[in-house]
Each structure stands twice: as C-alpha cells, then as structure tokens.
Swiss-Prot record:
This is Large ribosomal subunit protein bL25. Pfam families: Ribosomal_L25p, Ribosomal_TL5_C. Residues 207-219 have a biased composition (Basic and acidic residues). InterPro entries: Rbsml_bL25/Gln-tRNA_synth_N, Ribosomal_bL25/Gln-tRNA_synth, Ribosomal_bL25_b-dom, Ribosomal_bL25_C, Ribosomal_bL25_long, Ribosomal_L25_dom, Ribosomal_uL5_bac-type. Keywords: Ribonucleoprotein, Ribosomal protein, RNA-binding, rRNA-binding. It comes from Fervidobacterium nodosum (strain ATCC 35602 / DSM 5306 / Rt17-B1). The gene is rplY. This is one of the proteins that binds to the 5S RNA in the ribosome where it forms part of the central protuberance. Residues 197-206 have a biased composition (Low complexity). GO terms for cellular component: cytosolic large ribosomal subunit.
Length: 219
C-alpha cells in the first residue's frame, strides 16, 4: 500500500509565535532533508490528513512525499521516510515532523522492526521466548527497505538461539550487525531444568545400588 504525504512549503521559519499560530489552525510544522535534496525544505502538514497516515506507519515505512508551493504547484515528489517526530510534553500531540529524503540509487541505513511469526516449539514445551532485539539496522536501496523483518521461530527448541545469520532476508537487504549476534532465544525456566536433572539422577540410582551389592557378594 502506497502512503502519500502531502505538504506545503512554509515561508515563515524560526518565528515561534507564527509557529504557534500555525499549530492553532490545525497544522503541523515539518522539515525535509537528506542527500536526495539540494537543501532542506521547511514544510507544513495538514494535521488531520497526516495523523490518518501516521497511525499506520513506522520509521521504516516508505512514503511518497508530495510538496506544493503557495500557488499549489508541485515542487517535489520523492520517496521519503519519517526520521523524527516531536511530541507535546503535556498533550502528547505531534508537534513537529522530520522527513528524510534519500538518494534513489544509494544504499541507506535504517532501523526496521522485527515481526515474530509462529510459536516456538520450545515455548510449547514450557520455555520462555526472549527477544533480544525488537528492531535491527538494515542497509538497502530506498525502494528495497522492508517495513518489517519477519522471523519464523516455529522450529526454535528449548535453549536454542536465533542469530543474525539465520534470518532469511528479502533480496538486496542486509542486516548491519555481526552474523553471530543473537536476536531471539528460548530460555529454559529454572524449574524445568531441575525437573530434568532429578529424572536423570533417579534413573541412575538403582545401577549404583546393584553394583554395590554385587561387589559385596564377590567378597
């Protein structure tokens, strides 16, 4: 699904009073920057329209940023990502948005959330799945950046770990971490370990007793 964010060039920059008036009209000040632009652009967003899109996207969601000037003439249409969002400390409303505009033919580095698929066998057996990293940094061309990295944990047993090298990635995407870094593990609960140890000790005990009796008989 394509997400299109519409914005207008903002002529008033750096004037706090003007920015407050802007927010009072139901608008959100924003800025766009990055190697895909000759210079940063000061923008204004329609609050209602932006929030409809914002609740469905993440930092790694590709957006089509469409910018128009005061005469409603389109001056920019480019792939972009949300780089940063500032919130009001009291109301928690969006106060400002930063858009990152990458170069089309150069790889970029961006954090992508992990999405767990399936239920681990180890969890079915009583283990606890521990997610070490909820998101990972990836390198890819802007149009190849995935919204999420899906990881199937179905075959993960008790005590097993899933590392960066085990992840199946889309073509043209690489995780910018060490191959041996652990992403997910199924921890064996202490009670489960004790139970297994007790069973082993019990099964070995009769052999020790029998062996002792045989030695006494030989004497």
């Amino acid at each position: 699904m394509e997400h299109v964010v519409s914005a207008q060039l903002r002529s008033i920059v750096g004037n706090k009073r003007a920015v407050r008036r802007l927010r009072a009209t139901g608008a959100i000040p924003a800025v766009a920057y990055g190697p895909g632009l000759e210079k940063p652009l000061s923008l204004v967003l329609n609050k209602t329209d932006f929030l409809k899109i914002f609740k469905h996207i993440t930092e790694s969601t590709p957006l089509t940023l469409v910018v128009k000037d005061e005469n409603d003439k389109e001056v920019l249409k480019h792939l972009a990502f949300i780089k940063m969002v500032q919130y009001d400390k009291v109301t928690d409303e969006v106060k400002h948005v930063d858009f990152y505009v990458p170069e089309a033919h150069h790889k970029m580095r961006i954090n992508v959330p992990i999405e767990i698929v399936g239920k681990a066998i180890g969890v079915e057996k009583g283990g606890i799945m521990e997610i070490i990293h909820h998101e990972v940094p990836v390198k890819a061309l802007p149009d190849r950046v995935p919204e999420v990295i899906k990881i199937d944990v179905t075959n993960l047993e008790l005590g097993e770990t899933l590392r960066v090298k085990d992840v199946v990635l889309p073509e043209g995407v690489e995780i910018d971490m060490d191959d041996e870094d652990v992403l997910i593990t199924v921890v064996v609960p202490r009670g489960l370990e004790v139970e297994e140890t007790t069973t082993t000790e019990t099964s070995n005990e009769p052999e020790v007793i029998k062996k002792g009796k045989k030695e006494e008989e030989e004497k």
